C-alpha cells in the first residue's frame, strides 16, 4: 500500500473484564499486526482512520476504543522512516460470525486498500 507495508500475525478473542464488556451477543476481536514504513520520511499511523472490520453479514465495525486498555501494543502514532510498529487492533464484533474481513486503508482519501480474511476457527481463545 504505497509506502506502508502491513503484516497480519493472528487474532484472539477477548471477552472483557469487570470494567469493560462488549454488548450482549458480541465479543472483542483483537488483531495482531505490524505496519512498516518503507519510505524515507515519517508517517502517522491511526488505527481509528486506517482500519475497519466487516463480519460475514457485511456489517462494519470500527476500532473499539473501550478495549484499548487490554491490547498488547498500539498501532497509533508517528512511525519513522524505515521503522516498524506492532500492536493489536480491538474490534467489537458479533460473537456468532464465522468470518471477518480486516480492511487496511492507509490513504485517508481512499486511494487503495488491502483486505485480509480472518476465519473464526483460526482465532485463538
Question: In which residue ranges do the predicted regions lie?
Answer:
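Short strand-coil-strand connectors
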Residues: 1-2, 56, 105-109
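Membrane engagement elements in two modes
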Residues: 1-12, 22-24, 96-97, 115-125
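Hydrophobic core residues within well-ordered beta-strands of beta-rich domains
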Residues: 4, 29-31, 85
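Short, solvent-exposed beta-strand/turn "edge" segments of beta-rich domains on protein surfaces
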Residues: 12-30, 41, 78-80
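Surface-exposed coil/turn segments at beta-strand junctions on protein surfaces, enriched
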Residues: 24, 80-84, 93-95
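Beta-strand cores of secreted/periplasmic/IMS beta-sandwich domains, seen most often
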Residues: 28-41, 89-91
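The feature marks short-to-medium sequence segments in extracytoplasmic or secretory-pathway proteins
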Residues: 36-85, 112-124
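Short, surface-exposed ligand- or partner-binding patches at beta-edge/loop junctions that are enriched
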Residues: 86-117
